[in-house]
UniProtKB/Swiss-Prot annotation:
Domain notes: The presence of a 'disulfide through disulfide knot' structurally defines this protein as a knottin.
Protein name: Trypsin inhibitor 1
Transmembrane found in the keyword field: no
A GO molecular-function annotation: serine-type endopeptidase inhibitor activity
A family per Pfam: Tryp_inh
Reactive bond for trypsin (site feature) positions: 32-33
Species, as recorded: Mirabilis jalapa
Family statement: Belongs to the Mirabilis serine proteinase inhibitor family.
Record InterPro entries: Tryp_inh (IPR040875)
């Protein structure tokens, strides 16, 4: 169940920081989405 993590700037679920390799999902500066830090 250990899937590949999302790289920087990939879209991520706001409530799932561990979805990202960095463990950080942040709001995109311009778009109304969340991306991995």
């Amino acid at each position: 169940e250990d899937e590949e993590c999302a790289k920087t700037d990939q879209i991520c679920p706001p409530n799932a920081p561990n979805y990202c390799c960095s463990g950080s999902c942040v709001p995109h500066p311009r778009l109304r989405i969340f991306v991995c830090a």
